[in-house]
Amino acid sequence: MLLFAVPMILGNIMQQCYNLADTWIVGRFVGAEALAAVGSAYTLMTFLNSILIGMCMGSGALFSICYGRRALRKLKEYIVSSFVLIFSVTVILTIVSYVCLDPILTLMQIPADIYGLMRSYMGLILAGLIFVFLYNYFAFLLRSSGNSVIPLIFLGVGTALNIGLDFFFVAKLGRGVKGAAEATVLAQAAAGLGIALYALVKEPELNMKKMKEEGIGIRADLLKEIFSYSASTGIQQSVMNFGILMVQGLVNSFGTSVMAAFAAGVKICLLYTSPSPRDISGS
């Protein structure tokens, strides 16, 4: 149990160190306006990410049951059906977020002086949702088999890459909030694609050729069961973050300076909480 839990705890510590470093880089090299914009965007992205993370968590519970029972055919069927389901939700969520971005920012009461900064940041950062899905889907799949080390390794690679790219894009190239967004998306891509490739190569249950030979495919009855698990955990994970998003909207009404202070305060408060390690979610 300890060997399984320690990598997850280390991943959480790693994520919080990244959050503080990233906040410092944006605030130090770009300014209070950028920190306010990125801080509000972080709250919105955390809400969107939590929906996908919760759905991946629900699928992970089903994977664990199959591993425990050694029901390998059922496991493969769950993997195929759940991947298609959550991938589809990710694509829909990304498109809807892009289309409704202006109304969302209006509802969040983003001040006019940073509206352009936040819209520019969000326009780039939403592209990373697909990589958030990939990382968390395969991380929960690996953890369901008892492997919590590999997800930690790829989280560490993504975190280190994110901090390094932040310094390069923001501090050296002076790309501002666009640079911060680009750094985050590239780090998410590295972590998400990396863990996906690892799982596809190393996990025998994910052998595509064998799945095809065994006639493994999408099953409508399993989609309903998976959706039941995934939707409930997705809602559970996102409810608290939706509340924080509402608080962020109230904070935004007080102006840029208060928003910047709130953004820094939230990152510090995260050090005193213990969420499970999730992803490189944003600046």
Set out the residue ranges of the language-model regions:
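Helix-terminus/linker motif at the lipid-water interface of multi-pass membrane proteins
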Residues: 17-36, 105-112, 168-175, 238-271
